């Protein structure tokens, strides 16, 4: 039986994630106090149905470590996965301003900005222990739904899922990455006029990059790093390993390198997901 714990800052998209899990057949409970989790599990464990519960700031224990201790106390047969949904402060302020809803902590005589910052400290403990952090800053409801669906369905094999994503440094670092590799020192197809409008998925750009020894050497070294430590990472009960590859704009070099790595590990029999952040945003 799987137990999905969904948490995150208010306004980030927890309710959307929970609805996706419900659509996938999970028995869902919204805003369950952490202290009631063991009792709740004991009442439904014979149903043989996967469970998802959401925990928000209103039900967070005041003492740090309580959530992790509670999860550790549950039946070893449970496959527990914690998903944390988040967005940057400016985006959360924007969402609350557009919907005109009150933040759960606003009733404590705080401004919206203060409430959002205060919530960050309260939920920091569960975020630190999350198996997956999803940043919804630049995601639509549809994007978030597809991300949750892909990650959850991908976990059915119970193997660690390798997630490769390309990005552009000028658009900011991805917050969900476990490892970030900077490939801005590689030869740049951007400066070749006929290659400038293309991407790292196009054949001419591939031929340009594969023709440079340093590109091939870097891909080999990143691949070797992952292959060396993957067995230990799998033993650490991780659900995902997210490797981000960044170049200046996220169009050529990072796309090519991320795709090459994804293709290699997919061919090697690993569970792989690939995302090109800049290309998907266009």
From Swiss-Prot:
Signal peptide segment: none
A Pfam family that the UniProt record links to this protein: RapZ-like_N
InterPro entries noted in UniProt: P-loop_NTPase, RapZ-like, RapZ-like_N, RapZ_C
Binding-site positions, ATP: 8-15
Keywords of the record: ATP-binding, GTP-binding, Nucleotide-binding
A single GO molecular function term of this UniProt record: ATP binding
Binding site for GTP: 56-59
Role, per record: Displays ATPase and GTPase activities.
Family, per entry: Belongs to the RapZ-like family.
Name of this chain's protein: Nucleotide-binding protein PBPRA3258
Species per Swiss-Prot/TrEMBL record: Photobacterium profundum (strain SS9)
High-level lineage: Bacteria, Pseudomonadati, Pseudomonadota, Gammaproteobacteria, Vibrionales
